[in-house]
Regions:
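Conserved, structured core segments of small domains
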Residues: 1-138
Length: 138
């Protein structure tokens, strides 16, 4: 079965990773390099195990456009969202034998090197991907 692993971040998180002054301490170049090396290794392991279907990191929320229907008319709003709002930062789609295995994969993300304040608040969601209408029912 396929599962999507989702991670989240705010505009402040993206700014801090880029080394910009923000409400959160800026990441050092070493912090960022360690995170990138971990993600490359994590992804390589999933490729080698045959479990990786796709993965992508998303750009900062400031580059977002939201389309919403208001009084029957599509209205487009440019980012940024409120700086403290967490939005989707990246995802992995994995194909593995069970929800438990997908959860094990996601749990490895908790070991990603990052400044302490990031590690304390980082979360990953794991969701099964529906292949049929019946799987959409709960």
């Amino acid at each position: 079965m396929k599962y999507m692993i989702l991670t989240y971040g705010s505009q402040q998180d993206y700014d801090a990773m880029a080394g910009k002054a923000a409400d959160k301490p800026a990441w050092s170049a070493e912090d960022f390099a360690a995170m990138v090396a971990f993600m490359q290794s994590f992804t390589k392991d999933l490729v080698e195990s045959g479990e990786l279907v796709d993965t992508r990191g998303l750009t900062a929320p400031v580059h977002t456009r939201r389309v919403q229907l208001q009084q029957g008319v599509p209205v487009v709003t440019d980012g940024p969202y409120a700086e403290t709002q967490e939005v989707l930062a990246g995802y992995w789609i994995v194909e593995c034998e069970s929800f438990d295995r997908a959860t094990e994969i996601a749990a490895r993300l908790a070991t990603c090197p990052a400044p302490d304040y990031v590690a304390a608040s980082a979360v990953a969601d794991v969701r099964p991907i529906a292949d049929s209408q019946a799987e959409l029912e709960h």
